[in-house]
């Protein structure tokens, strides 16, 4: 599945900035629950962006069994504060815009 040509399927994207001694931009979007796996059309997007002085590294690789793996490494106390706030905001935002799961 090539996801990046399907970002528009996530609907409206929501963005926020988190800053202390650095600024971390976070963007999320989802078209909510679609009744199953990726073949059913559900898409969720999350992006972290260094907007100012964020010690941020990311790596996409294959795990031990060929599965996808995403690693994010941040350096510094301010970055720790920012990622905590960013992840909390991202989870709350995704939860609020996702339609209820189907029974």
Place the predicted regions along the sequence by residue.
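Positively charged, low-complexity terminal tracts
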Residues: 1-103
């Amino acid at each position: 599945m090539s996801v990046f040509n399907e970002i528009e399927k996530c609907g409206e994207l929501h963005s926020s900035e988190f800053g202390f001694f650095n600024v971390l931009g976070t963007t999320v979007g989802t078209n909510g629950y679609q009744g199953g796996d990726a073949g059913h059309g559900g898409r969720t997007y999350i992006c972290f962006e260094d907007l100012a002085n964020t010690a941020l590294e990311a790596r996409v690789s294959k795990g031990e069994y060929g599965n996808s793996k995403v690693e994010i490494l941040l350096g510094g106390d301010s970055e720790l504060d920012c990622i905590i706030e960013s992840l909390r905001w991202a989870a709350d935002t995704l939860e609020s815009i996702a339609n209820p799961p189907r029974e």
